[in-house]
From Swiss-Prot:
Entries under InterPro entries matching the protein: Spore_coat_protein_Z/Y (IPR019593)
Protein name in UniProt: Spore coat protein Y
Pfam family, one: Spore-coat_CotZ
Organism of derivation: Bacillus subtilis (strain 168)
Source taxonomy: Bacteria, Bacillati, Bacillota, Bacilli, Bacillales
Transmembrane segments: none
GO biological process, one term: sporulation resulting in formation of a cellular spore
Domain of life of the native organism: Bacteria
Amino acid sequence: MSCGKTHGRHENCVCDAVEKILAEQEAVEEQCPTGCYTNLLNPTIAGKDTIPFLVFDKKGGLFSTFGNVGGFVDDMQCFESIFFRVEKLCDCCATLSILRPVDVKGDTLSVCHPCDPDFFGLEKTDFCIEVDLGCFCAIQCLSPELVDRTSPHKDKKHHHNG
């Protein structure tokens, strides 16, 4: 398969990967002890129900979007993120929640590169985007340990939004 060519739904590697991620997340949420991908998510560890990932466009660029536009929720800060969690999948269209990047203090960041030196972890949000997975050529799964990563600092400026 190559980028930009029209293929059937089952020939899109990004769509297939997101479908597998969703199945694994749902298995953990349902406390399914026999998930096929338990090496990524362990159903016995409470709170680890997210496989964060990055998606790349057909030119190799990272896809990014914005959360909390207008600053109406939590710390009132709009942010840019390249990190996502799959929520729903229908054919090759997906609802992705935008994961909020945070620094070691738990403050919201705008992150356009995964190696940003201030980036420490991710928090789940209720901000979502609808995407056509056929528009992407690559996906990179990240460690579930990035989500709700424990920080040595306690004074956070916003509340967790799950």
